[in-house]
Each structure stands twice: as C-alpha cells, then as structure tokens.
Swiss-Prot record:
It comes from Lactiplantibacillus plantarum (strain ATCC BAA-793 / NCIMB 8826 / WCFS1). Binds 1 zinc ion per subunit. Belongs to the universal ribosomal protein uS14 family. Zinc-binding uS14 subfamily. This is Small ribosomal subunit protein uS14B. InterPro entries: Ribosomal_uS14, Ribosomal_uS14_bact, Ribosomal_uS14_CS, Ribosomal_uS14_sf. Pfam families: Ribosomal_S14. It comes from the Bacteria.
Length: 61
C-alpha cells in the first residue's frame, strides 16, 4: 500500500522540480532506475534475458 500511495503522490507533481525522482515504470522501485529505459536494474536485466529489449545482449569478453 505504501508503494501505491507514493506512486500516486508522484503523479500529482512536485512543487519544485528538484523534488521529482525517477521510479521504475514496471515495478515502482525508486532506486537504481535507468533514465533511458525508465526501468530499474532488476527489471532491465529480466527483460534483457527474455530478449524483449531490442539491441541489448549479454556482454562477453
């Protein structure tokens, strides 16, 4: 419930731009969110393993 209320609070918009922060669009996690994908590292990895992110592949060297 706390996560849902925080997401709803964020959608209303902050009084100042500095107060805005990124959240994962898939799970709502506030930490470690990649701006380019709007996903947290956990969801990004999961979708990459499933092959649902075009052009992303596992690094090998």
């Amino acid at each position: 419930m706390a996560k849902k209320s925080q997401i709803a609070k964020q959608k209303r918009g902050a009084k100042f731009n500095v107060q805005n922060y990124t959240r994962c669009e898939r799970c709502g996690r506030p930490h470690s969110v990649y701006r380019k994908f709007h996903l947290c590292r956990i969801c990004l990895r999961d979708l990459a393993h499933k092959g649902q992110i075009p052009g992303m592949k596992k690094a090998s060297w």
